[in-house]
Amino acid sequence: MSPSEFAREVSKRRTFAIISHPDAGKTTITEKVLLFGQAIQTAGTVKGRGSNQHAKSDWMEMEKQRGISITTSVMQFPYRECLVNLLDTPGHEDFSEDTYRTLTAVDCCLMVIDAAKGVEDRTRKLMEVTRLRDTPILTFMNKLDRDIRDPMEVMDEVERELKIACSPITWPIGCGKLFKGVYHLYKDETYLYQTGKGHTIQEVRIVKGLDNPELDAAVGEDLAAQLREELELVQGASHEFDHEAFLSGDLTPVFFGTALGNFGVDHMLDGLVAWAPAPMPRQSSTREVVAAEEKFSGFVFKIQANMDPKHRDRVAFMRVVSGRYEKGMKLRQVRTGKDVVISDALTFMAGDRSHVEEAYPGDIIGLHNHGTIQIGDTFTQGEDMKFTGIPNFAPELFRRIRLRDPLKQKQLLKGLVQLSEEGAVQVFRPIASNDLIVGAVGVLQFEVVVARLKSEYNVEALYESVNVSTARWVECSDVKKFEEFKRKCELNLALDGGDNLSYIAPTMVNLNITQERYPEVVFRKTREH
């Protein structure tokens, strides 16, 4: 392949994730994005939770029952001249770790806001995460077919609470039953709303010009007058779109629409492919790696167990950073120093998998994993480097787990270790007892683990409360002091799923006193994978 062909493939890629509060319409938008990219012909509506048409990206048993996305799926689809990789992140408020790691693998995010509610708690948390890497953000104000808050007010709230400037690209005409469409500020065109449900994309009627009498006839004189008045205000009070400010994460273009009504999503996608960055450089332990480099490199940001109930398998999701993956190529797994031939990498269309012949920077490929790959692993064509910035968080909630059938201890341990490797939960094995303690960032993770142990490993487990309030990973360069610490604190020490030593504290007071007593020991709240 010639360098110019390779450069063209790289420049076509856009890799993004959707962030939102639960129920802001993220799953619907995911489907409609795929629909506009023609990847799904029938966008199975999520509201029909009793029907068999589950949302294309919610494919695990518990997700199917609840209608929330618990695991990250990956979908690739063509749009205009580009190839778009969409990473679906869990929408439920609990799943911050998995979501966080997914956000390390994208170059851009789409923030979905319920225009009736404005900025909500989960959106704030996710925006904090994107801030750490200055990820560019596009915004979609959703649910315009319902009664919403004043759009100016919602934009002000975004600017105030999320500390990002808003630049409206489209502007709504009415809302709820009176929703008539949107006006595009940069094209001077009005797109008239016709509801399109499911997988029908309606032909949209376009009215050119703001002073066109056709506009008054189409939306009514009152709404047309209101639109002109609002636009004067908007153009005076809001920011003009500035591509540099967008790329540095300081400004977000804002689009209005209704995902359920298949309206406005294409305007946002047009903005995404026009403005979002092609695959970005990434920092490694030794240098910055640029997408256009000839040699392949990539990192694993997620491990998913049992994606195919028919095959007991685990798949490691790898973001390609540089070079080109070709079927059958030999790659070095840097952590182990082993060279492996990868002949059966997968690409995904949410649950439908197919084998990949080639992949480029920005693409996500799946590697079959028989317990040898971990989150954070770097693969190269021989270079000894590790991509940085893929963290593990100290859990905030803890339970002791025990079996209904004590003879299944081996299966329980296997299941927990596999679930901890994919980041669904963290497992701690206290050194001084045979207990198994499970740590999570949110309550729902505990339910997920018990449900998956039962459905995937045939193990029935129960939780009991345990006297642990927090955990820290510990290390110390002074061997003698560390031995003394380990001897005296044995009752509070445990090994996590990766056999890293951690201190489990019954109270924050206990942790603070221990830290004061052993100043040479480092207590870490996060750990690089």
UniProtKB/Swiss-Prot annotation:
It comes from the Bacteria. One of its GO terms (cellular component) is cytosol. GTP binds at residues 20-27, 88-92, 142-145. PROSITE patterns: G_TR_1, G_TR_2. InterPro entries: EF-G-like_DII, EFG_III/V, G_TR_CS, P-loop_NTPase, PrfC, RF3_C, RF3_dom_3_sf, RF3_GTP-bd. One of its GO terms (biological process) is regulation of translational termination. It is found in: Cytoplasm. GO terms for molecular function: GTP binding; GTPase activity; guanosine tetraphosphate binding; translation release factor activity, codon nonspecific; translation release factor activity, codon specific. Keywords: Cytoplasm, GTP-binding, Nucleotide-binding, Protein biosynthesis. Residues 11-280 form the tr-type G domain. Transmembrane segments: none annotated. Increases the formation of ribosomal termination complexes and stimulates activities of RF-1 and RF-2. It binds guanine nucleotides and has strong preference for UGA stop codons. It may interact directly with the ribosome. The stimulation of RF-1 and RF-2 is significantly reduced by GTP and GDP, but not by GMP. Belongs to the TRAFAC class translation factor GTPase superfamily. Classic translation factor GTPase family. PrfC subfamily. NCBIfam families: prfC, PRK00741.1, small_GTP. This is Peptide chain release factor 3.
